[in-house]
């Protein structure tokens, strides 16, 4: 694909298909797409060179995904069979002499838009490709609320955006306390993202007899290297708040066994706030196969953390020394201590003492498995595959890899194919009981090892010292929930590639969201679990949840969910639909009631082509707006909007009219309104009607008449500006059906409060205010011809004498000369609109009528 030849729309389409940001100029879009294309190259082109120094850390390839995107994983090459010794005991190189992570594309970790560079004390290098991806990536929440990226998790440099973009981001959304996880789930469901095509996870021909990190018994956001002895967590966006755990594939229940773990890197997470406690920490230890990945936070899960504390069942106690990057922790399990099992640890070869004593009877003969829980750290294990250990081992202990296979207990093996996997999609309103049912169902089916995909499960992995982050969290709670929702969207995309069993714990009331979320899981056993309690039970559960967790979902969001609630049906994307409480018939009736309730309480449907305003200045916000399809703007808008500048037909009040093809307002038929530019019922200055009129051939004007011997007495001033009987401008045209051929003046009266533009009374057809116009210059050759438009036939006109009661000083000749210049300029300006004025012959104007002569 030649990125340079793609158009902007094509670039955005390609970026959207890959789940990348589609905002920016064409150059930025092209750079972003080029980076994504390079990231899709095979792994053998993206690995480190084989001549890397032994012991030097290689690249950590992290994935680059945006919301709605898919995980870009390459093809994993199987490691050579058997155990391969490393080049150096203290090195961090893989079996091939270099460290190549699990065919995963790089993860964007930074939000710095000026200097996108990771500071790495351990020497982890980043190639230009990663920098291009980091520069191309902009965190965003493209939602119906149009809410921008949160800034509280960004470094100060991230706010230094380009000026041309920053000026459009000055308006801030109001902060609402009641935006919890349910609200952001609802907002995501409203979004109409295109589903990503399902992708198969490449199979590895890994030797299953080796002790290694179990890719089935680890978190989805823990990335395992191809040699299965090292790994690291995702750290972009909200993932930096999450713990990420993994267990080994084999456990033990007898003997004296050990393994080692080394912290290779504390991954930079500059986007975390400075108030985040312990942004880099590792917890290492043992657990049962039935335990979750949250080491040390439940029974039979024992861990020793880098904060110098040991923990089990979320009880933390001081133990040993703190440890950090480049430290090596040895883990020892002694099953030969009578009726107890003793667990102890070493730091860099120094024994920390016995940490836990467990009764064998309590274990019930179950095996303990090596377990690690990390937060923004890359780690590597030594299960015995290395020729030499990192540090000295306590006497009498054996690496778990060196035990006979018969003495090792294999952990739970995952499904062999996607046909054996289940995806259960919860469907129900907030507080209906979806999470409660999911937890109970997973606990009652431990062999399936359900992965619950929900914001609540994400928040459980953000614990601090084993405690959930509550609303007294130092930062913005709604922003943290928003980050968790982003993580969930990414995990759903990753989950579609992994052969596991899942429970999708979200509302999923939108039919479009149901289809979109199930399509990537093609090949799974896709089932919908509908929880629809009675309306009374739902209200009680909502009150209880609000008391426990606070207001989670705004009322308007719940009403919108009710209005769009769609019960799923067995079809293309669902194999089975189960109703937990109300069954199908009762649920259908209740959902129809919810639909009606939501539609009545919700706002009216949005109209894409609507004119809502009337009366804005010069029509920028009034007179109908920028609408090509409807002319519903009420009269009164000043100048109207595009294609509707004339306002209502014949209505008064529109200033200067506009270009109205419908003929509304003034200047209709004969272009001047009802033959009188100052007519009461026409718009002041009217609107220009483009519609050509079928007119007879223009007639030759009669010869000019001699002026009257005596001018009329000067009129007097009146607040009405145009007093009754005052002479007004009348441009006559030979138009069938009009009164243009009669020279009867019409009276124009404007009240002072009306925002109209009236001028001192004068007759543009003949200045009859008591002066003799100078001889006009010869008119230029006509430059415009309206074709079928009727020509002007200014008939001789003698204005009637004004009322005697109206007297005011005689206007001077200079005033009339100034008016003449203004009108001449006015008609010259009309020539700047050839699309609207065609080839009309305006003639020249210099103290006389257009095409006629002045009279007195």
Curated annotation (Swiss-Prot):
Q: Where is this cross-link: Glycyl lysine isopeptide (Lys-Gly) (interchain with G-Cter in SUMO1)?
A: 117, 142
Q: Where is the composition biased (Basic and acidic residues)?
A: 53-62, 118-130, 173-192, 595-611
Repeats (sequence): which ranges? 612-614, 620-622, 639-641, 645-647, 656-658
- Where on the tree of life does the source sit, at the highest rank? Eukaryota
Task: Please list where the region (Necessary for interaction with BRD7 and transcriptional activation) is annotated.
Answer: 456-594
Keyword Repeat, does the record have it? yes
Provide the positions where the record notes the PTM Phosphoserine: 194, 512, 718
Q: For the region Necessary for transcription repression, give the residue spans.
A: 612-658
Ranges annotated as biased composition (Polar residues):
104-117, 725-741
Q: What InterPro entries would the database entry show?
A: B30.2/SPRY (IPR001870), B30.2/SPRY_sf (IPR043136), ConA-like_dom_sf (IPR013320), P-loop_NTPase (IPR027417), SAP_dom (IPR003034), SAP_dom_sf (IPR036361), SPRY_dom (IPR003877), SPRY_hnRNP_U (IPR035778)
Instruction: Indicate whether Nucleus appears among the record's keywords.
Output: yes
Q: Which residues form the SAP domain?
A: 3-37
Tell me what PTMs the record reports for this protein: Methylated.
What's the protein called, per UniProt? Heterogeneous nuclear ribonucleoprotein U-like protein 1
**Which residues does this entry mark as bearing Asymmetric dimethylarginine?**
639, 645, 656
Q: Identify the taxonomic lineage of the organism of origin.
A: Eukaryota, Metazoa, Chordata, Craniata, Vertebrata
Tell me which GO cellular component terms the UniProt record holds.
nucleoplasm; nucleus; ribonucleoprotein complex; synapse
Additional free-text comment from the UniProt record: Its methylation is enhanced in the late phase of adenoviral infection.
Q: Which residues carry this modification: Omega-N-methylarginine?
A: 645, 656, 661, 671
Give all Phosphothreonine modified positions. 209
| Organism of provenance | Homo sapiens
The protein's assembly and partners = Interacts with the adenovirus type 5 (Ad5) E1B-55 kDa, BRD7, PRMT2, TP53 and NXF1. Associates with histones and BRD7.
Identify the gene encoding this protein: HNRNPUL1
Residue ranges of the region described as Necessary for interaction with TP53: 213-856
- Gene Ontology MF annotations: enzyme binding; RNA binding
């Amino acid at each position: 694909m030649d990125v340079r030849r793609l158009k902007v729309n094509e670039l955005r389409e390609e970026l959207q298909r890959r789940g990348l940001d589609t905002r920016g100029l064409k150059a930025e879009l092209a750079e972003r797409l080029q980076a994504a294309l390079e990231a899709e190259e095979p792994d053998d082109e993206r690995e480190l060179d084989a001549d890397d120094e032994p012991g030097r850390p290689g690249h950590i390839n992290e994935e680059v995904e945006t919301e709605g995107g898919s995980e870009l994983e390459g093809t994993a090459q199987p490691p050579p069979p058997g155990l391969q010794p490393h080049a150096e005991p203290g090195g961090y190189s893989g079996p091939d002499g270099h460290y190549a992570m699990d065919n995963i594309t790089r993860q964007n970790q930074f939000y710095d838009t000026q200097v996108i560079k990771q500071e790495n004390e351990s020497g982890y290098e980043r190639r230009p490709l990663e920098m291009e991806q980091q520069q191309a990536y902009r965190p965003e929440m493209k939602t119906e609320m149009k809410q921008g990226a949160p800034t509280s998790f960004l470094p100060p440099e991230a706010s230094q955006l380009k000026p041309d973009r920053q000026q459009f981001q000055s308006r801030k959304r109001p902060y609402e306390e009641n935006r919890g996880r349910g609200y952001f789930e609802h907002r995501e469901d409203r979004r109409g993202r295109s589903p990503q095509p399902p992708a198969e996870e490449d199979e590895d021909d890994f030797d299953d007899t080796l002790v290694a990190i179990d890719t089935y018994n680890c978190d989805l956001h823990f990335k395992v290297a191809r040699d299965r002895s090292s790994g690291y967590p995702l750290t972009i966006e909200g993932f930096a708040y999450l713990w990420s755990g993994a267990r080994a594939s084999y456990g033990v229940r007898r003997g004296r066994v050990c393994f080692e773990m080394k912290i290779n890197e504390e991954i930079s997470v500059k986007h975390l706030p400075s108030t985040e406690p312990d942004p880099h920490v590792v917890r290492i230890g043992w657990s049962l196969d039935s335990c979750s990945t949250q080491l040390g936070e439940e029974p039979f899960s024992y861990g020793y953390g880098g904060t110098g504390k040991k923990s089990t069942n979320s009880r933390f106690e001081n133990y040993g020394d703190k440890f950090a990057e480049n430290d090596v922790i040895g883990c020892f399990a002694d099953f030969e201590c009578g009726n107890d099992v003793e667990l102890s640890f070493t730091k860099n070869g120094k024994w920390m003492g016995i940490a836990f004593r467990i009764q064998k009877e309590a274990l019930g003969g179950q095996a303990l498995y090596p377990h690690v829980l990390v937060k923004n750290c890359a780690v590597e294990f030594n299960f015995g595959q290395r020729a030499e250990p990192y540090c000295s081992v306590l006497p009498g202990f054996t690496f778990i890899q060196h035990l006979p296979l018969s003495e090792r207990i294999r952990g739970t093996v995952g499904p062999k194919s996607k046909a054996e996997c289940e995806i259960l999609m919860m469907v129900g309103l907030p507080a209906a009981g979806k999470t409660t049912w999911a937890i109970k169902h997973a606990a009652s089916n431990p062999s399936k090892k359900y992965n619950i995909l929900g914001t609540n499960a994400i928040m459980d992995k953000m614990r601090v010292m084993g405690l959930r982050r509550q609303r007294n969290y130092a930062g913005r709670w709604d922003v943290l929930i928003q980050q968790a929702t982003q993580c969930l969207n990414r995990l759903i995309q990753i989950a579609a590639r992994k052969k596991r069993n899942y429970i999708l714990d979200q509302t999923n009331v939108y039919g479009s969201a149901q289809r979109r979320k199930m399509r990537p899981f093609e090949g799974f056993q896709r089932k919908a679990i509908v929880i629809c309690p009675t309306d009374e039970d739902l209200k009680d559960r909502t009150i209880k949840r609000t008391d426990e967790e606070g207001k989670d979902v705004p009322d308007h969001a719940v009403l919108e969910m009710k209005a769009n609630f769609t019960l799923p049906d067995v079809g293309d994307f669902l194999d089975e639909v189960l109703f937990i409480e109300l069954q199908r018939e009762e649920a259908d009736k209740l959902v129809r009631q919810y639909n009606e309730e939501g539609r009545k309480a919700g706002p009216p449907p949005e109209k894409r082509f609507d004119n809502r305003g009337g009366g804005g200045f010069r029509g920028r916000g009034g007179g109908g707006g920028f609408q090509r399809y409807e002319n519903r703007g009420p009269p009164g808008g000043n100048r109207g909007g595009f294609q509707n500048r004339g306002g209502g037909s014949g209505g008064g009040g529109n200033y200067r009219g506009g270009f109205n093809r419908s003929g509304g307002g003034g200047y209709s038929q004969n272009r001047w309104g009802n033959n009188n530019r100052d007519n009461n019922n026409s718009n002041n200055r009217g609107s220009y009607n483009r519609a050509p009129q079928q007119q007879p051939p223009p007639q030759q004007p009669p010869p000019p008449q001699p002026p009257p011997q005596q001018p009329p007495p000067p009129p007097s001033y009146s607040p009405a500006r145009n007093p009754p009987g005052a002479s007004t401008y009348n441009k006559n045209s030979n138009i069938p059906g009009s009164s243009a051929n009669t020279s009867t003046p019409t009276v124009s009266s404007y009240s002072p409060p009306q925002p109209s533009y009236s001028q001192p009374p004068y007759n543009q057809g003949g200045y009859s205010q008591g002066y003799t116009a100078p001889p006009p210059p010869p008119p230029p050759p006509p430059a415009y011809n309206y074709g079928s438009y009727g020509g002007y036939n200014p008939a001789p006109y003698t204005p009637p004498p004004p009322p005697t009661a109206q007297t005011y000083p005689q206007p001077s000749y200079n005033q009339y000369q100034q008016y003449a210049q203004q009108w001449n300029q006015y008609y010259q300006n009309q020539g700047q609109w050839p699309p609207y004025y065609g080839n009309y012959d305006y003639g020249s104007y210099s103290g006389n009528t257009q095409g006629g002569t002045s009279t007195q």
